[in-house]
UniProtKB/Swiss-Prot annotation:
Belongs to the annexin family. Giardin subunit alpha subfamily. SUPFAM superfamilies: Annexin. Giardins are involved in parasite attachment to the intestinal mucosa and in the cytoskeletal disassembly and reassembly that marks the transition from infectious trophozoite to transmissible cyst. They may interact with other cytoskeletal proteins such as microtubules in the microribbons or crossbridges, to maintain the integrity of the ventral disk. Annexin repeats lie at residues 3-72, 74-146, 153-222, 226-295. One of its GO terms (cellular component) is microtubule. It comes from the Eukaryota. It is found in: Cytoplasm, Cytoskeleton. The keyword ATP-binding does not apply. Keywords: Annexin, Cytoplasm, Cytoskeleton, Microtubule, Repeat. PANTHER family: ANNEXIN, ANNEXIN B11. PROSITE patterns: ANNEXIN_2. This is Giardin subunit alpha-6.
Length: 297
């Protein structure tokens, strides 16, 4: 028997009305983002309310409610709202890395569209205005959000530029390279630069910079190598701190769990048991849902 989109919307409705959190997460985990979008439309058509609103009404306040509501909402809208929150009051610099650097060109376009729809403002303008220009890390964001990358066909020259910039502590040049180099060329530049330096790029950057300046460089570096590398890096940071960063774990999970296989591979390469880390760091209500979404035991 073929399961239709309407059937899935009904299953989701039943899960929400019975507050079956594991079923809500399980349904999200079982279907791709495009399939979930169809379910969202069917849910709205059948019930007259959005799935995210229904989930928030059915569940108690807290991180679990946020996670499940994010799963069943448009990713661009979720990202737009989270960025808006991150820019409210004192900027949440960790969240900005998660939401701006860890974001594809297509996802950024959708986020900008949703942001303008929701707030009648231009996201790029608001972001640059709020973060200012005093801190070095903002230079990466200035280039990154344009999503204008192209091959320069000068791998040798770019490798020398990168090595020289690290040696001279030239943050501006590195920020510009991270924001404008094509993904394919960046990987080649990095391979050659690491031979010249005799160490990995992350080791070289870590020897020169620290705190948010370093965090943004590393995030952009990992994202260009592969988004799953950055997702794992951010999750590990959130899990291994003195106090688990639930908000970051929820952000990364809600917006990235479709790539769970690649992220788990990155974790396995590092010899990191991400399933055990989730179980240890999170409470008994949230941990099972996170593990369902990442498909770990």
């Amino acid at each position: 028997m073929v399961t239709t989109v309407q059937d899935l919307a009904e299953q989701l409705r039943q899960a929400v009305e019975s507050s079956n959190e594991q079923m809500i997460a399980g349904l999200a985990s079982a279907y791709s983002g495009k399939e979930r979008e169809k379910v969202l439309r069917a849910y709205l058509s059948a019930t007259g309310t959005t799935a995210a609103d229904a989930i928030r009404k059915a569940l108690k306040n807290g991180p679990t409610e946020n996670l499940l509501a994010y799963l069943w909402d448009k990713p661009g809208d979720v990202r737009a709202k989270l960025i808006r929150n991150a820019l409210s009051g004192k900027n949440d610099e960790a969240a900005l890395i998660d939401l701006v650097i860890h974001c594809s060109s297509e996802d950024w376009y959708n986020t900008c569209t949703e942001y303008t729809t929701d707030y009648k403002r231009v996201l790029n303008d608001d972001l640059l205005s709020d973060i200012g220009t005093k801190e070095q890390w903002t230079k990466v964001f200035k280039h990154w959000i344009l999503h204008k990358r192209s091959d320069r066909f000068d791998i040798d020259g770019d490798e020398k530029r990168l090595v020289t910039a690290i040696g001279k502590k030239d943050y501006d040049t590195i920020a510009e390279m991270l924001g404008t180099t094509s993904v394919s060329e960046y990987a080649n530049i990095v391979r050659r630069a690491e031979v010249t330096l005799g160490k990995t790029i992350d080791q070289a950057l870590s020897a020169v910079w620290s705190k948010q300046d370093l965090a943004v460089l590393l995030a952009a570096h990992y994202e260009l190598l592969h988004p799953a590398r950055l997702a794992f890096h951010l999750l590990k940071q959130a899990l291994d701190g003195k106090k688990p960063d639930e908000a970051r774990i929820i952000r990364i999970t809600a917006l990235t769990f479709d790539t769970c296989l690649a992220v788990k591979y990155a974790a396995s390469e590092a010899g990191y048991d991400i399933g055990s880390a989730f179980a240890k760091a999170l409470d008994k209500r949230l941990a099972p849902l996170i593990k369902i979404l990442w498909r770990v035991m």
